[in-house]
A protein has these predicted regions:
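Catalytic-core "active-site belt" of small-molecule-metabolizing enzymes
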Residues: 1-156
Length: 157
């Protein structure tokens, strides 16, 4: 699995939930390969989290890109954040990689071929719906995200 490019605060509801602002253009953070946990052939996956620390979760639409940064596949993902460690890092002015990109923090579902249509994504915990949205509610569209990703971070020829 390659490095993951994650979009920062791409839903208004999530930004409000964490008392943050949305950004005027897509801003990214990286998730190293060790943060990804892929599901098995039955769509099952599991991670171990530190139970004495505050862990938040956010459902995500995950897109796998090809060699030319074109969308190839997609899946539902769960981005987890260790708020205890992230808050401490922010207070100290430290990088917050430890709170955001730790081992197992990016849980991935079963991959399917890329489909650009509007999708509904949701997250349930113990049968209770915690998050439910559609991809057209994203602050930054997929096209805008890809434009910024390729213009700013894309390969240099």
């Amino acid at each position: 699995m390659a490095v993951g490019w994650a979009v920062f605060r791409n839903y208004v509801g999530h930004a409000k939930e964490i008392k943050g602002d949305v950004t005027d253009y897509p801003r990214f953070f990286l998730m190293p390969p060790t943060s990804h946990v892929e599901s098995d052939n039955y769509g099952n996956n599991s991670i171990s989290l530190l139970v004495d620390e505050h862990i938040d979760y956010e459902v995500e639409m995950v897109v796998r890109l090809g060699d030319n940064l074109e969308p190839v596949e997609m899946c539902i993902g769960c981005d987890t954040t260790n708020r205890t460690r992230q808050t401490l890092a922010k207070e100290k002015g430290w990088p917050w990689l430890e709170g955001k990109s730790f081992r197992g923090s990016g849980v991935l579902g079963t991959w399917a071929p890329w489909d650009p249509r509007i999708m509904e994504i949701g997250l349930s915990l113990n049968g209770e719906t915690k998050q439910l949205a559609t991809t057209d509610l994203m602050v930054h569209s997929f096209d805008s995200i890809m434009e910024h990703l390729t213009n700013w971070y894309g390969p240099v020829s």
